[in-house]
């Protein structure tokens, strides 16, 4: 049986109290939202926690506020958000990305804030204690070596949060709260290209809210999301593609193409975006631009499927996602 | 670390039960170990298999990923609380009549996930049933009878007369050999 390790539980009833407890406890404390990522990681002893601070009773983190921009409380469940009218009508590709996370029974617990902070994943890390001990662990937890790239000085674990690439493509912002105050940064600036130190937020900061700009909604952008995985019913992705295109007079004036589940952070495929800008959304221009995604994707042997194959199919799925955003094909997959 | 003990009043199957348990124990552990409700099964314990599914305020959730100390004030329903008095829940009837279980280990979780679906959507399509059960793994049946049984349970719950199709129970008749 996989029991959780013993910890002290704190259940604050306001954001200020949660921040105060977190700064007082220091980095040995962990914050829990839905628990769908932290509990498995604690059960497998991937992570440690002397104190767990639950955000379940913090009222400031609940709710969807839709005005010009749409602000999503970090404790909103994935199940509520995939059906939230403000997302379904104005940010449909984000609703789709959120709906592609794991399974319905998990989305009833998992939260947006938790997904945004999802721990990076790797074949050599997402294993139980005994399995990892048998290989003397890896550098992400307790070991010294990266088994994916043994001569590498860094960890290559993959960022698989499905909301992340879409939030980056939509130019979303995240509000971070701490006892020292609050700040709002682009979601793109929340992630670092490192499998271990993968979030740019400080350990005493809590993800409080995600803000979607009015200029990124369906009235302004053509968007699409695609997720490649072994089983459509539940699995983590091995590649996701988030696309947001602005067009004027039939030509692309701005483009964001962000790849997920392929590196330690949601990776912008800048070459693809540059190739699209100024071009009409035709079969030919989309195919030519999608070909340039091959360079942005260098999958490692750290998740499901052959890494070479994942690299080879990246342009195929970038092309399909661009075609869906352009309205040339119906969106499918995910 | 000396485990911290929590004392909470949990509402399980309509009954308020005050229980003491280690604060780091999951709802699954407290249901089975403190409350003796072993109908909810222990599977992967990582949120991947769905056999520990229970209802929390009417929503199907994975009890292996919920801390028992957090559910005070929430309405928990397990497979033991599915029937009403001596009447089986329509899904329990359809699963039993059709034989939609083999080893049966996934059945409690599937009944709970399916009951949440029917409460929200009394006439789900096959695609909606499949989507609602996407997080519930079955390694025996191949899912065919489970999907049929959920549709049968939905029909019974709507007050319709439902019988398992003979070919679902006995298989299709063998082809008659041609006369030589």
Annotate each language-model stretch with its function.
Chain B
Residues 1-180:
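Signature of N-terminal electron-transfer/Fe-S-associated modules in redox systems
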């Amino acid at each position: 049986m996989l029991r959780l390790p013993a910890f002290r539980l704190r259940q604050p009833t306001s954001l200020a109290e949660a921040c105060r407890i977190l700064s007082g406890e220091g980095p040995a404390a962990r914050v829990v939202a839905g628990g769908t990522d932290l509990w498995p990681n604690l059960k497998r002893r991937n992570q440690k926690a002397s104190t767990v601070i639950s955000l379940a009773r913090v009222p400031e983190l609940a709710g969807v506020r839709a005005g010009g921009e749409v602000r999503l409380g970090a404790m909103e469940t994935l199940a509520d958000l995939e059906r939230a009218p403000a997302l379904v009508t104005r940010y449909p590709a984000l609703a789709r990305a959120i709906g592609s996370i794991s399974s319905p029974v998990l989305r009833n617990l998992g939260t947006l804030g938790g997904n945004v902070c999802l721990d990076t994943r790797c074949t050599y890390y997402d294993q139980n204690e005994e399995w990892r001990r048998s290989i003397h662990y890896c550098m992400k937890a307790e070991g010294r070596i990266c088994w994916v790239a043994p001569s590498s000085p860094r960890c290559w674990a993959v960022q698989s949060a499905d909301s992340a690439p879409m939030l980056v493509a939509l130019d979303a912002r995240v509000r971070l709260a701490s006892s020292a105050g609050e700040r709002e940064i682009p979601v793109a600036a929340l992630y670092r290209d490192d499998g271990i130190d993968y979030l740019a937020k400080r350990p005493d900061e809590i993800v409080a809210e995600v803000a979607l700009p009015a200029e990124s909604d369906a009235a302004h952008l053509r968007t699409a999301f695609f997720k490649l995985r072994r089983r459509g019913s539940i699995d983590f992705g091995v590649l996701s593609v988030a696309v947001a295109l602005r067009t004027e007079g039939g030509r692309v004036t701005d483009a964001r193409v962000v790849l997920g589940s392929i590196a330690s952070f949601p990776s912008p495929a800048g070459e693809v975006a540059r190739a699209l800008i100024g071009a009409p959304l035709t079969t030919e221009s989309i195919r030519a631009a999608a070909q340039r995604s091959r360079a942005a994707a260098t999958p490692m042997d750290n998740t499901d499927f052959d890494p070479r194959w994942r690299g080879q199919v990246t342009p195929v799925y970038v092309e399909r996602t661009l075609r869906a955003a352009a309205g040339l094909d119906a969106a499918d997959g995910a | 670390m000396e485990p911290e003990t929590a004392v909470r009043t949990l509402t399980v199957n309509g009954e308020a039960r005050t229980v003491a348990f280690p604060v780091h124990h999951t709802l699954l552990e407290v249901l089975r170990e403190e409350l003796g409700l072993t109908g909810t099964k222990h599977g992967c314990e990582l949120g991947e298999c769905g056999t520990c599914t229970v209802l929390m305020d009417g929503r199907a959730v994975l009890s292996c990923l919920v801390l028992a100390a957090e559910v005070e004030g929430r309405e928990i329903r397990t497979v033991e609380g599915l029937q009403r008095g001596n009447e089986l829940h329509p899904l329990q009837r359809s699963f039993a009549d059709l034989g939609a279980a083999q080893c049966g280990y996934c059945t409690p979780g599937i009944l709970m996930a399916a009951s949440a679906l029917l409460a929200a959507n009394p006439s789900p399509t096959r695609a909606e049933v499949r989507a609602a059960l996407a997080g519930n793994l079955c390694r025996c049946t191949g899912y065919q009878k489970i999907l049929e049984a959920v549709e049968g349970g939905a029909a019974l719950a709507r007050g319709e007369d439902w019988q398992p199709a003979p070919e679902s129970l006995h298989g299709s008749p063998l082809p008659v050999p041609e006369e030589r």
